[in-house]
């Protein structure tokens, strides 16, 4: 079982790869690619023609296919060719070197500022304006912020599947733990509840009391404690006092349940996506999950007893934290106009409504539960919920779904930084060494800050700031 439970984890994008990309990309180094069917970089037109090559978007399920079909039809007579494999920095480097980049790429939102800083993708403000879309209102604020760099928007966000606590009511009842004891605004109370629900057999965990998804969701917990991995400009702030407090709590939580290594080993043995998942087997008291995991659990809806709890900061404020992907247009794209039109249409209200209809049909065929779609767009989320999310016959799952929707009221994300991948990696490493006892939390974060700061100083923003 993976310790990182964001559905779409950030691609590993090393600085050396990006430097190579900048060196070999003609658009990033002052050259230009001859556009086909549109004007050049930064210029968009509704007069569509030529071929559109996309990379990273995979219409493998009904949600993706319905959106893709609608967008592909909208860009006609331009023809669409898809490379459905995930974005890969090395592959993109080779494409840039040959001058054959895709016209449209799908990437994790956290690396959009990195690509923008290196001049590898182009700002989309003119694209949005052409089609009458205001990203500030079309998408959740945190999603738009993630793809904004130096005041310009470089991506078209998709999905915002917020994190929440999903607890096993059977384990809670056996331990005498109530739902209000899982209030994350009271971190010491969480540790106490974890201790009550934790069980061991033969010196090894048999029930994890509270799994905070570490190090995968470390940044979420920094924000719970009022901290952040970076400042408003994207500069790393890993060694800030609030972050040290957060990591100290993470260590305390793990130590209260047999220690990080033992918990990780036990979690790795869990059948998280199968019919014998940890909620079926009552192997966990509570866990942090993205909204999408409700879909996984629905396959075993008759075997689990669960309750959802929203995540709050220590000052009691709701925290709807999520990552996600974005569509971006390479600077050297040959058909940016078709790419722009496709991306805007694929994330339009019409596209998400079509996706909602397609998901509803699948849910009906499988006799499953419709948990809604968390699209990244408030209007689309509401439209799909109003049309398709109805009482499921399971009070537990209705409560989970309602809780998930409630987390969208106040959105948050990792942030926007040209050194985002390096900051994320440094944080993950710091959490791992602190939880394992190799370093104390303050030292681990101090060392992580030094590593992340070096990466920041090699970005254009870092050199200029």
Give names to the regions the model predicted.
Residues 89, 227-311, 444:
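Extracytoplasmic ligand-binding clamshell segments of periplasmic binding protein
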Residues 129, 148-216, 228-265, 329-337, ...:
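Helix-loop-helix "hinge/cap" segment bordering the ligand-binding cleft or interdomain interface
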Residues 44-45, 125-139, 182-183, 206-208, ...:
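Short, solvent-exposed loop/beta-turn-alpha elements that line the ligand-binding surface or hinge
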Residues 2-114, 350-354, 438-443, 447-465:
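Conserved N-terminal structural module of periplasmic/extracytoplasmic solute-binding proteins
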Residues 90-101, 118, 171-172, 191-200, ...:
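Short helices/loops that flank or line small-molecule/ion binding pockets
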Residues 293-303, 315-321, 329-425, 463-464:
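C-terminal lobe and pocket-closing loops
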Residues 84-92, 110, 184-191, 264-277, ...:
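Short helix-initiation/N-cap motifs at beta->coil->alpha
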Residues 110-162, 307-308, 465:
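Hinge/lid segment of periplasmic solute-binding proteins
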């Amino acid at each position: 079982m993976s310790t990182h439970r964001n559905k779409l984890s950030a691609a590993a994008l090393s600085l050396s790869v990006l430097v190579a990309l900048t060196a070999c990309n003609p658009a990033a180094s002052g050259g230009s690619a001859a556009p086909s069917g549109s004007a050049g970089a930064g210029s968009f037109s509704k007069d569509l023609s030529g071929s559109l090559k996309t990379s990273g978007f995979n219409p493998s399920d009904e949600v993706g296919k319905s959106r893709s079909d609608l967008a592909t039809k909208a860009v006609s007579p331009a023809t669409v060719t898809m490379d459905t494999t995930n974005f890969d920095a090395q592959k993109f480097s080779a494409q840039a070197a040959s001058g054959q980049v895709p016209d449209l790429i799908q990437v994790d939102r956290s690396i959009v500022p990195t690509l923008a800083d290196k001049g590898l993708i182009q700002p989309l403000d003119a694209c949005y304006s052409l089609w009458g879309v205001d990203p500030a209102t079309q998408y959740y604020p945190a999603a738009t912020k993630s793809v904004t760099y130096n005041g310009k928007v470089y991506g078209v966000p998709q999905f915002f599947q917020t994190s929440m606590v999903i607890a096993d009511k059977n384990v809670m009842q056996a331990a005498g733990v109530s739902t209000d004891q899982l209030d994350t605004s009271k971190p010491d109370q969480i540790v106490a509840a974890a201790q009550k629900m934790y069980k061991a057999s033969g010196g090894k965990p048999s029930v994890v009391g509270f799994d905070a998804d570490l190090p995968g969701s470390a940044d979420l917990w920094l924000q719970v404690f009022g901290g952040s991995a970076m400042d408003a400009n994207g500069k790393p702030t890993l060694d800030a006092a609030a972050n040290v407090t957060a990591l100290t709590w993470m260590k305390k939580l793990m130590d209260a349940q047999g220690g990080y290594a033992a918990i990780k080993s036990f979690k790795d043995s869990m059948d998280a996506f199968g019919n014998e998942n940890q909620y079926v087997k009552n192997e966990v008291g509570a866990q942090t999950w993205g909204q999408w995991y409700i879909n996984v659990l629905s396959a075993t809806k008759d075997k689990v007893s669960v309750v959802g709890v929203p995540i709050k900061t220590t000052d009691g404020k709701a925290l709807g934290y999520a990552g996600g992907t974005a569509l971006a247009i390479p600077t050297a794209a040959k058909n940016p106009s078709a790419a722009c039109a496709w991306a805007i249409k694929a994330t339009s209200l019409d596209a998400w409504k079509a996706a909602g209809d397609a998901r509803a049909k699948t849910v009906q065929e499988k006799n499953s539960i419709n948990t809604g779609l968390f699209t990244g767009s408030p209007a689309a989320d509401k439209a799909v919920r109003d049309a398709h999310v109805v009482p499921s016959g399971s009070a537990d799952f209705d409560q989970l779904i309602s809780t998930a929707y409630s987390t969208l009221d106040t959105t948050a994300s990792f942030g926007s930084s040209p050194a985002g991948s390096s900051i994320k990696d440094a944080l993950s490493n710091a959490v791992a060494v602190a939880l394992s006892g190799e370093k104390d939390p303050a030292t681990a974060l101090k060392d992580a800050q030094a590593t992340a700061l070096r990466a920041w100083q090699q970005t254009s923003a870092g050199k200029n700031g």
